[in-house]
Amino acid sequence: MTIPTSRGKRTTFFHLIRFFIFFLTCFNGGEANCGSGCGLALASYYVWQGCNLSYISNIFGREIPEIVQYNPGIHNSDSISSDIRINVPFSCDCINGDFLGHTFEYETVAGDTYRKIATSAFANLTDEYWLNRVNRFRPNDIPDRVPINVTVNCSCGDGSVSEDYGLFLTYPLRRGQNLSSVAEECGVPANLLRRFNPGADFAAGSGIVFVPAKG
């Protein structure tokens, strides 16, 4: 689905989106001035009550068997527990030469707001501020069944920290977590997490960090 404007207007709108995302990345600690992406990243998606794999598959554009491949704990793809995290693969691109991420096209439903899309549909993998800046609708007046752009940051790692990891998880922090709990949950040394995320506050209860995974 495309935005119903002329080709020239679509191109202008596209470049405005890229500019705003780059601007926001500079002020939000994203990885800037990339040369290339790394093909694959994982999103740590917190499954909310009533969510299922069909929904997750649809918004990320990935087939269910591909998602299950990265989640050995899922034994029944027709039914998954809520209040757990699952890993969702997505391509980690160098967007406009500026930063690493991937822009998904999400089709709105009745009652959507930027806050709801960020916190529920995309499980805090992005935030309301970003969505508001790179899309043209008012935050609480979004039409039904229109495409909006949702950008999720990713990481290809840092060779100066370690070259042992080629796959990284975009991990939204939740209330009650800290460096030790994230390290224990993900099976990664706390010191390594800190080095891959300099300046990150793991106890903030919000925001994202990048967790190395073998790949």
Over which residues does each language-model region extend?
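N-terminal signal peptide
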Residues: 2-7, 20-37
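Intrinsically disordered, low-complexity regulatory segments of nuclear proteins
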Residues: 8-11, 84
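A mid-sequence interfacial segment
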Residues: 10-13, 142
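Sec-dependent signal peptide recognition
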Residues: 12-22
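Extracellular LysM carbohydrate-binding repeats and other cell-envelope/extracellular binding modules
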Residues: 30-39, 63-101, 127-163, 190-215
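Primarily a LysM-type cell-wall glycan-binding module
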Residues: 31-63, 90-127, 156-192
